[in-house]
UniProtKB/Swiss-Prot annotation:
GO biological process: brassinosteroid mediated signaling pathway; circadian rhythm; developmental process; regulation of DNA-templated transcription; shade avoidance
Biased composition (Polar residues): 19-30
Ranges of residues in domain bHLH: 43-92
Family note: Belongs to the bHLH protein family.
Assigned keywords, A-Z: Brassinosteroid signaling pathway, Growth regulation, Nucleus, Repressor, Transcription, Transcription regulation
More details: Plants overexpressing PAR1 are dwarf with compact rosettes and inflorescences, epinastic leaves, shorter flowering stems and siliques and a general dark-green phenotype.
Domain of life according to the entry: Eukaryota
Organism placement in taxonomy: Eukaryota, Viridiplantae, Streptophyta, Embryophyta, Tracheophyta
Disulfide pattern: none
Region feature (Disordered): 1-59
GO CC annotation terms, alphabetical: nucleus
Name of the protein this chain belongs to: Transcription factor PAR2
Recorded phenotype for the gene knockout or disruption: Slight increase in the length of hypocotyls, cotyledons and primary leaves.
PANTHER family, per the entry: TRANSCRIPTION FACTOR IBH1-LIKE 1, TRANSCRIPTION FACTOR PAR2
Length: 118
């Protein structure tokens, strides 16, 4: 299947183009390629679904754990649980700061040998 290019001065031969060298209808190239792509897409889709299921299970487990940690969390929906969690964290931070202040105060009192109560 060699093509000949004719010009006014010379005659040249060019190699066959890749598309003409492979007869896609007789070799079934397109059909096999489409099948492999389809199989690859199907396996990726199955993997994606499995990953999503695992992700959902992981999220549900974490929400259940959060419900047990936050006071009253078992009676709350997810949105309210997140809001309550944020409030709970702020309350815990305030308690930590109060304990730090009390600790500092008591350490100073011990250094001065101050006595309480009487």
């Amino acid at each position: 299947m060699e093509k000949t290019l004719a010009t006014s001065h010379t005659k040249r031969s060019s190699p066959p183009s890749p598309s003409s060298a492979v007869n896609t209808s007789s070799t079934g190239f397109n059909r096999r390629t489409r099948q492999r792509l389809s199989d690859a897409t199907a396996s990726v889709s199955e993997t994606d679904v499995e990953d999503e299921d695992e992700d959902e299970e992981g999220v549900e487990e974490k929400i259940e754990a959060l419900q047990t940690i936050v006071p009253g969390g078992t009676e709350l929906g997810v949105d309210a649980l997140f809001e309550e969690t944020a409030s709970y964290i702020l309350a815990l931070q305030c308690q930590i700061n109060a304990i730090k202040v009390l600790t500092t105060f008591l350490e100073r009192c011990e250094k001065k040998d101050m006595k309480f109560g009487g």
